[in-house]
Amino acid sequence: MAYGTTLSQRATSLLDTVAPKGGLVTAAAAAVLGSALLAVSAKVQVPFWPVPMTMQSMVVILLGMAYGSRLATATVLLYLLEGLAGLPVFAGAGAGPAYMAGPTAGYLLGFVLAAGVTGWLAERGWDRSPAKAVAALALGHALLFVPGVAWLAVLFGAEKAIAVGLTPFLAATVLKTALGAAIMQAAWTVVTRRSRV
């Protein structure tokens, strides 16, 4: 099925289109690659105003769009397990259980929610329409911020949580949403052209 047009229909994911006969090995390789991309995207900082940005949130939601809900969620959970085990996969130097229960805990939960929901929307064809892709990626970013800011509010109060955990990242989020939608449209254009050859 090329497009999912109702909530019960499932469209083929970008990964399934590229590797239609992929099985468990393909899924495992994709999960490992995705968790590596998350780790790299956490470490690379891009100068931006008012604060430098990483591309990690965009990678989370693009994994959802490209992999579909189940594999994207599994990929993000693998990434979090790597961090829980103490591997240096997060933006800072910290890792392990104490780090994951700290101020970033809500955002880490948000990664799982964002990947799962954007993947679910992609399975219904939202990754193929520019407007729907923007909407799906914006929703993915919102799902990332809601638990992140909520947990910061528990730790530091609502006003400080919004001031340090949301407001400085809004401009970068708009940019990453637009860039992510453009990447998905370009990826589908390339895949569609190759399938016609």
Locate the predicted segments by residue.
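Peri-membrane helix termini and adjoining interfacial loops of integral membrane proteins
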Residues: A2-A11, L84-V89, G157-K160
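Hydrophobic transmembrane alpha-helices
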Residues: A2-T73
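Short helix-perturbing small/polar motifs within transmembrane alpha-helices
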Residues: Y3-A19, T26, L33, V40, ...
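Juxtamembrane/transmembrane-helix boundary motifs in multi-pass membrane proteins
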Residues: V18-G22, T26, F48, F90, ...
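Hydrophobic alpha-helical transmembrane segments
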Residues: A28-V32, M58-L62, A72-L78, T104-L109, ...
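Alpha-helical membrane-inserting segments
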Residues: L37, S41, Q45, L63, ...
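Alpha-helical membrane segments and adjacent membrane-interface helices in multi-pass membrane proteins
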Residues: A42-G116
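Membrane-embedded alpha-helical hairpins and interfacial helices in multi-pass inner-membrane proteins
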Residues: G125-V197
